[in-house]
Amino acid sequence: MDYISLGKSNLMVSRVGFGAMSLGEIDTDENASALVHKAYDAGVNFFDISHSAQESEKRLGACLYGIRHNVVLATKACVLDARDLEECLDDSLSALRTDYIDLFQYETDEKNIVAFDEIAAQMERLKERGKIRHFGLTTEDFEIAASALDSSVFASIQIPFNILVMKQVESLVKKAQEGDIGFVAMKPLYGGLVRNIPLALGFLYQYENVVPLWGVRNIEELSQILYFNAHPPLVDEQFESEMENIRAFFS
């Protein structure tokens, strides 16, 4: 497993990120634990969840019991007032069975709801109290992500990035790298529409600062991701042709 620094933070994260939003939907606690521990045993150390998925947070907290300090744990919260971040954080800390979050992300798709400087000020207070180590931003909106990068207050941004949303978001990848800001790619399979895992992975691995966040649902999916992470496809003319075929199909 390869590891990269998440921007200018001191967080070294696995190149395979584990998106745990669906963990609460797995049929048993035992199967959820088996999935998380298979990823961990393969070297995955970056686990991402959300305050909005309380059952999944609780499951993840239980699964990481005993190994929590060996992983980079990220969660996020959507608020209308920066002062509400701490309440959401406290909920997540309880659910995740931990006393700190490595990466706490402000989540928004609405422009100008809360000013970034207000978010940053509150996040800094949470850092001073030892509740978080770093803070980032999660959004599905290109303009919000661009503004966040321009503000330089966040350690990372998380936004959908995949074969089908390449051209516009690619500029953000470059800007993040230039600003030494971590870039987490959510929806690498475009919410399941792209079924070719090696193609999706090979595309993202062309960008050395990008950490794909895979929404893992079962052992079979995880096994494929881990296999192609260890054996990435060759980016050649055939690879490019297959990417263009997928884009043409969805255009």
Residue ranges with predicted function:
Residues 1-71:
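N-terminal binding-site loop/beta-alpha segment at the start of enzyme catalytic domains
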Residues 7-10, 41, 60-69, 90-99, ...:
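Acidic (Asp/Glu)-rich catalytic clusters
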Residues 58-76, 121-130:
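Alpha-helix-loop-beta-strand connector modules within alpha/beta enzyme cores
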Residues 6, 18, 47, 60, ...:
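Conserved, mostly hydrophobic/aromatic
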Residues 93-113:
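Active-site groove signature of glycoside hydrolases
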